[in-house]
Curated annotation (Swiss-Prot):
It is found in: Cytoplasm. The gene is murA. SUPFAM superfamilies: EPT/RTPC-like (SSF55205). One of its GO terms (molecular function) is UDP-N-acetylglucosamine 1-carboxyvinyltransferase activity. It comes from Bdellovibrio bacteriovorus (strain ATCC 15356 / DSM 50701 / NCIMB 9529 / HD100). This is UDP-N-acetylglucosamine 1-carboxyvinyltransferase. Pathway: Cell wall biogenesis; peptidoglycan biosynthesis.
Length: 414
């Protein structure tokens, strides 16, 4: 991706459907045979990878105009192979549905972005609490249970994937399951809403205690994927960093309160409605500190983009990453553009240098890091070339087209 610094962005831009809601919802289709229909499904590499995995399990996936259809048949095999799972961590989310519906699942241990260990132990402990037998051998996890039984399970640490996987498994268990210290992310709420449309009985989603009353059967439904709050936040920061005026539509500002609060604290004027947010031109902004944490606090998935904004702020900002231990890989690349950042294990000190970034060749290391490099490139003088943008395609739908529509000089070269 070649990015030229080109002054303020101006205009209106819409967000796509949320990747992090779409993936668990697609895997949840395994709970109900028949035809599931989705709207607002983003066209992303991770959606392609999920389709490939579902197809390998006997499903049929296809686009019908703007709708995405998943036809679920009884799988000929209950194994999700290494070749498919290594592309994307979220693939492990097929385990809960298969285990609940068919009593067995064999899933390769996961891959995805290299931003920390993100262990699957909490998922497996949750399955065990529902009565499943788990064995691990030769890089695969084998789970089996004639019939899952409801129970109470406390997550030792907050885990989004673990909450989703165990919640899906519990929908078909005998009796009531209570998940304590559950994750509260909006994407979990979207998943629970789809499961309830299929006939599940879930309450408490969006709080730290989720209650699932098991049912005998689920049936396919139709659902619109929620807007992507991380993409919305990235686009808002793009407007801010270029001193532009950008309105982001088809979003839910209530999902981004932590980001909006910090941007206002830095000096930006931001106006919101129920489903839009506008950032106004700001000549200079102050450095502010952030600490990432599970929702509703500052999202780790916006940490890299916010760091880009802080590289050109007035003053010094301290960025603390509490969610993943290896999430400062963008620091060395931002430094190549002239940013002044001192990283330690989980803390980065960013000394703002407004107007001092200059274009250079940089390399994306993960999905959100790639976005931060594009944002920095928008305000660096000269040309910034971001390589390995396949990371970007995993989670952003046509980001260069959206930024171009706002006046950015950005193009993709093969």
């Amino acid at each position: 991706m070649v990015v030229m610094g080109n002054g303020p962005l101006k205009g209106t831009v819409a967000t796509s459907g949320a990747k992090n809601a779409a993936l668990p919802i697609l895997f949840s289709t395994l709970l109900a045979e028949g035809n599931h229909v989705f709207t607002n499904m983003p066209k992303l590499k991770d959606i392609e990878s999920t389709s490939e995995l579902l197809n390998s399990l006997g499903c049929e996936t296809k686009w019908v105009g703007d709708e995405f259809h998943v036809t679920v048949n009884k799988p000929s095999s209950f194994e999700a192979s290494y070749d498919l799972v290594r592309k994307m961590r979220a693939s492990f989310l097929c385990m809960g549905p298969m285990l609940a519906k068919y009593g067995e699942a064999v899933v390769s241990q996961p891959g995805g972005c290299a931003i920390g260990s993100r262990p699957i132990d909490l998922h497996l402990d949750g399955f065990r609490a529902l009565g499943a037998t788990i064995t691990q051998k030769e890089g695969y996890v084998h789970a089996g249970s004639p019939k899952l039984k409801g129970g109470t399970f406390l997550f030792e640490t907050v885990t989004v994937g673990g909450t989703e996987n165990v919640m899906m498994a519990a929908t078909l268990a005998d009796g009531v399951t209570v998940l304590e210290n559950a994750a509260k992310e909006p994407e979990i709420v979207d998943l629970a809403e789809y499961l309830n449309k299929m006939g599940a009985k879930i309450t408490g989603h969006g709080t730290s205690v989720i209650r699932i009353e098991g049912v005998a059967k689920l049936t396919p439904a139709k659902h619109s994927i929620m807007p992507d709050r991380i993409e919305a936040g990235t686009l808002l920061i793009a407007g801010a960093i270029t001193k532009g005026q950008v309105t982001v539509t088809k979003c839910v500002p209530a999902h981004l309160e932590a980001l909006i609060l910090k941007m206002r604290e830095a000096g930006f004027k931001i106006e919101t409605t129920k489903d839009t947010m506008t950032v106004f031109p700001c000549d200079q902004w102050e450095a502010v500190d952030i600490t990432t944490a599970p929702h509703p606090l500052f999202p780790t998935d916006l940490q890299a983009q916010f760091m880009a904004l802080m590289t050109v702020a007035h003053g010094t900002s301290v960025i603390t990453e509490t969610v993943f231990e290896n999430r400062f890989m963008h620091v060395t690349e931002l430094s190549r553009l002239g940013a002044d950042i001192t990283p330690k294990t989980r803390v980065a000190v960013v000394r703002g240098c407004p107007g001092k970034l200059t274009g250079a060749p940089v390399m994306a290391t993960d999905l959100r890091a790639s976005a931060s490099l594009v944002l920095a490139g928008l305000v660096a003088s000269g040309e910034t070339v971001v390589s390995r943008i396949y990371h970007l395609d995993r989670g952003y739908e046509k980001l260069e087209d959206k930024l171009s529509s706002l006046g950015a000089k950005i193009r993709r070269i093969e």
